[in-house]
Amino acid sequence: MEKLSYKTLENVGYDGYLLKDAKEKVLQFGEGNFLRAFVDYWFDLANEKADWNGKCCLVQPIAPGLAEMINEQDGLYTLHLRGSVNGEKVDDKRIISSVSRCLNPYQEEGFNEMMKVAASDDLEIIVSNTTEAGIHYDPSCQFEDKPAASFPGKLTQVLYHRYKNNKPGILMLACELIDNNGKELLKCVNQYIEQWNLEEGFKKYVNEECTFCGSLVDRIVPGRIRDPQEVARLEEENHYADPLTDVGEVFGLWVIEGDEKLNDVLPFKKAGLIDKVFVTPDMSPYKKRKVRILNGAHTGFVLGAYLAGQNIVRDCMHDEVIKGFMNKMLYDEVIPTLTLDKNDLLNFAKAVSDRFNNPFVDHELMSISLNSTSKWKARVMPSFLGYIDEHHALPKCITTSFAFYIQFYRGYELTDAGLVAKRPVGNTYTISDDRDILEFYYNHKDDSVKDLVHAVCTNTSFWGQDLTQIAGFEDAVVQTLTEIEEKGTYEVMKECL
């Protein structure tokens, strides 16, 4: 069967939206599943809805990559956005035509083409998602390298070439999942300017004429379809083969931190995507919303749900007690501590239920349980402390989630793989966390409930503070943990409702 290309689509009589030729307005570092299901999708919608008439030229950030495959398909690929919307199963298919080509800068021709795009009058935006490890300063990179090994090194080379060609400053959108991604990237570029002794005029160009924006990205992207039968079925339906087929969830949100005038460059407001992709002077409330509601919900209920016999998130959403516990925690104890518009928070929480109920994604509770100690501190504890400040009382569900956390970590055997514990339904499971945390729980495996709770609550290396100083908390956790031993986590959840 013919691979996806403009010619193939013409041959099969495809009549959906396509943009074959347009200016390369975006240089994108990263060609993986996430960016193609997220950034390139939004630009594709902007082309259709706002007549933006722009293409994204992709760059492989590391030597092994997809450039050859992408170019073989004229930059085209099929995107499936799958999930649940208001409880209804959704599978939206779209051919994305916002990508012009993909360059491999580790080949001479690819490097030269990257520099040509850098100096182009058409270029307006640079986007990156080079993984959490991508934004780092590597002093071994040299200006003469073709290319510099690190992404910030490559970006410095690109910006310098643009500067030397007297082209205007650029808008830089960092999508990496680290705090202050835009600022951290700019910091790395400035380090290379110093290391490579580049002129003061270029430093001024980077820091004053270019705009480095942080951004918050939110979409789960499972990536390619692995089931050969489904691949065969889709090829039959589409009348073409597409090894670059990508899958993401329906929900998507891109919050870009910066001045309102960025909307003069970005096409998303004009395209009517303002609730999905928008500019805000401060993205921290949106980050807090995601961490506390989406991630906090996961950490708050999954350990108790796993001990109650569940294995995947979706099944938890079909259990009235577990879902009820999650909702009570979110609506009564988490949302009241957040400062964004109330309707905005409620809509986000409602979307979380749909996302957790995704019929296409088997999200395992055990995968979410990884590093639950630091997750509880980062995702749940701020809501816990905020609730206490406001109400001068303990939040019942969050306090219960802390007891679930301790119960989950009550292992009996320490191995190289982790701390082994036994589930009430009979099977064993292995807890994954920092070694010192696992050793702590192993060393306290024979403690009484009272002693264990005291040891956990007073471990300031876990929580950054002594939790026994919070009035009534230690006693409440002891009581809840005792009830868990007697009745199990499911009954304890039920009693919270």
Residue ranges of model-derived segments:
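Substrate/ligand-engaging "lid" and interaction regions
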Residues: 1-497
